[in-house]
Curated annotation (Swiss-Prot):
One of its GO terms (biological process) is one-carbon metabolic process. Its cofactor is Mg(2+). It comes from the Archaea. This is S-adenosylmethionine synthase. Catalyzes the formation of S-adenosylmethionine from methionine and ATP. Signal peptide: none annotated. The lineage of its organism: Archaea, Methanobacteriati, Methanobacteriota, Thermococci, Thermococcales. The gene is mat. Belongs to the AdoMet synthase 2 family. ATP binds at G139, Q140, G141, S142, V143, D144.
């Protein structure tokens, strides 16, 4: 092992790999789910503010926009097209520098524009002028640019603004991959072109018991795109077949697929919506209540409860360390021979450089026939290399190369 300049600890983890456990649960909330809408808007606002700060001042000023609330509206969907009678209310809050050298920076204008642009792309049937109200109450802050630049020179590596930890793991299990790829396919541009009636509010739940997997899909169907029950059932069948194709591409286990199981034909209950999201009908959403940074909710795995979306990409370890842990775990799983599973946990200490965590814990389950002794050094080197280049994550975020939900 190399001299441990950083506090990186690589050890063997003694536990049953997830793929061999009897029961596995996996969930993904699609991009149109109210919680995902909150995450998406929070992150879009943070990235827009970051880019505008750089454009005007050459540096990202302090902000955290991870407090977004989606308050459900009220709608009357019906086959052929219904109506939204009470709009969805979206509250943008958090904090951002608004006064720079005694001049106003347009925080609210940038934030609302970013939120509208995100919604336009994320929820196709949402009428931004009639179906939603966006209210920015982002708190104010002021800054002296000279002081900011001097601090940046003194600390080229940002200092952690919190004592917090991030968690990542790799590789994904078969069930995790199926859940993730199912939602991505159903919300892909290609699938929407063929089946425009499928809304963006798609929740996929996976349950594996032994060698049998149940995939339950709740997909909001857009009422204006289905004229009757025949159309509705045709859309459900298309969802079923698409999910079946995904499952068959990732496993040889038996897979059962269920679509919109709350439908009750005798009572005339079907999952139709005006906009493609349940937020129109009273379902609320909050940042951090949904997917982790790898896009999944995985109770069989180590997880952090930090909300990554909307946190600033410079010094907020609640965002940076979760992404970093995932990237380190992915590289170890892909590049180091003999790794069955790897879990990475990184803990910061407030006020310390983010490339010097209090600990970076790498736990590895070796494959049968392999020893942790041959895995420790390359795993350490991968973790150390990422910490050396930690500011790269900020660039990757602003280039939209990393998702946070």
């Amino acid at each position: 092992m190399p001299e441990n300049v950083r506090n990186i600890v690589v050890e063997e983890l003694v536990r049953t790999p997830v793929e061999m456990q009897k029961v596995e649960l996996v969930e993904r909330k699609g991009i149109g789910h109210p919680d995902s809408i909150a995450d998406g808007i929070a992150e879009a606002v943070s990235r827009a503010l970051s880019r505008e700060y750089i454009k005007r001042y050459g540096i990202i000023l302090h902000h955290n926009t991870d407090q977004v609330e989606v308050v459900g509206g009220k709608a009357y969907p019906r086959f052929g097209g219904g109506e939204v009678i009470k709009p969805i209310y979206i509250l943008l809050s958090g904090r951002a520098v608004e006064i720079v050298d005694r001049e106003m920076f347009p925080v609210h204008e940038v934030a609302i524009k970013a939120a509208r642009e995100y919604l336009k792309n994320a929820v196709r049937h949402l009428d931004l002028d009639h179906h939603v109200i966006i209210d920015s109450r982002i708190g104010q802050g002021s800054v002296d640019l000279v002081g900011v630049f001097n601090k940046a020179k003194e600390n080229p590596i940002p200092l952690a603004n919190d004592t917090s930890f991030g968690v990542g793991y790799a590789p994904l299990s078969e069930t995790e991959r199926i859940v993730l790829e199912t939602e991505k396919l159903l919300n892909s541009e290609e699938f929407k072109k063929e089946w425009p009636a499928v809304g963006e509010d798609i929740k996929v739940m996976g349950l594996r018991k032994g060698d049998e997997i149940d995939i339950t899909i709740a997909a909001a169907i857009v009422d204006s795109e289905v004229q009757n029950l025949d159309d509705y059932f045709a859309v459900k069948e298309a969802i079923y077949e698409a999910a079946k194709d995904v499952a068959e591409a990732h496993t040889e286990r038996k897979v059962n697929i269920y679509v919109n199981t709350a439908d009750d034909p005798e009572k005339g209950i079907y999952y139709i919506t005006v906009t493609g999201t349940s937020a129109e009908a009273g379902d609320d959403g909050s940042v951090g209540r949904g997917n982790r940074v790898n896009g999944l909710i995985t109770p069989n795995r180590h997880m952090s409860m930090e909300a990554a979306a909307g946190k600033n990409p410079v010094s907020h370890v609640g965002k940076i360390y979760n992404l970093l842990s995932m990237l380190i775990a992915n590289d170890i799983a892909e590049q180091v021979e003999g790794v069955e599973e790897v879990y990475v946990r990184i803990l910061s200490q407030i006020g310390k450089p983010i490339d010097q965590p209090l600990v970076a814990s790498v736990q590895v389950i070796p494959k049968k026939g392999y020893s942790i002794d041959t895995i420790q050094k390359p795993a350490y080197e991968i973790a150390n290399a990422w910490l050396d280049d930690i500011t790269k994550i900020q660039k990757m975020i602003l280039e939209d190369k990393l998702n946070v939900f």
